[in-house]
Every structure is written in C-alpha cells, then in structure tokens.
Amino acid sequence: MADEKMNEGGVVEEAAGALERLLPEHPVLAGLFEQFTDVEWRRSSEQHTAVVPKDRLRDFSLAALQAGFEMLVDLTAVDYLRLRRVRFEVVVGLLSLQHNVRLRLRVPVPADDPNVPSLVPVYPAANFFERETFDMFGIVFGDHPDLTRILLPEDWVGHPLRKDFATGAVPVQFKSSPQVT
C-alpha cells in the first residue's frame, strides 16, 4: 500500500510512479500497443498488463490471439469494494508459447453494470472460467453459450466472493440433501 494513496472520497489510487507505462519492449506486445491506443499498458515486476475497456475486450482478445497469444491460462475477477471507483475487475491471463511471453488483461467492470463480453468465441477455454466468475462474483458474460452456476446449486442466493456477501453461522439446507434435524 506504500505506492497507493487515498483520495478524499476514500478511494485508493495508484501513485503516479508506481508502474511503468511505457511502450512494451517485446515486439508482439508493441504491435498490440500500436493497434489499441485506448488500452493502458503497464509493466510491473516483469509482468506485462493491458487495462482494456470492456467494450474493446473481444476485439483486443482476437488481436492478441492473432498476434500469437494462443492460450488463455486463467480468467477470474477481483472485488475492490470501497477501494476503487470501479468496483470489479475481470483479470485474464494469456500466454504465447511461440513468443515465450505472458500478458495479463485487466478489465474494469462497474458495479451498476456488471456485464462483460464473453471470450468463449475467441478462447473456448474461457467457458468454465467465465461460469465460475459468474457464480462467485455475479459478473455476466454476454453471449456465453451456457452461463449457469458451476460450483453452487442453482437456487443459491448471492455471489460468495463479493466483499459484501453476508457471512454467518446460518445453516444452509441444499435442496438435494436430507433434512437436518
């Protein structure tokens, strides 16, 4: 938290010098950088990160695939409740085996519109990752072929990895389990 500061609204912001915001040195990343001028590029601890607007996610992902990022390694989300202006962030890990480089995509997602385009048409491996992120965070992936819960029962109320999810010692009765007496 040393590289972050609190503004008057109580929102943590990254300090200006915390991350490098330079043209990526790797030629594959530099090509994407030039193609997408609205994407913010960061590099910290040898990790290349692109902050992609959610309406450009599918276009950027398709360009990344064509540039050689053939593997989607991971897709998840982060809930920054009361820490940032934009509450959620979808985080996507891509890998280029042929160029030996990784790229992390961070997609800001506002709480009042938790919708992001699905990456399944570009990376079929995103299927179960998106279902898990929907199940745990409530982020909806538009055009997903089967956006249903994957870990919790269909009748579960809420999304347990949200910071405002109520926790407590209330016994949970699942519809398929025997009654607890």
Listing of model-derived features with the role each one plays in the protein:
Residues 1-181:
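Terminal low-complexity/charged segments
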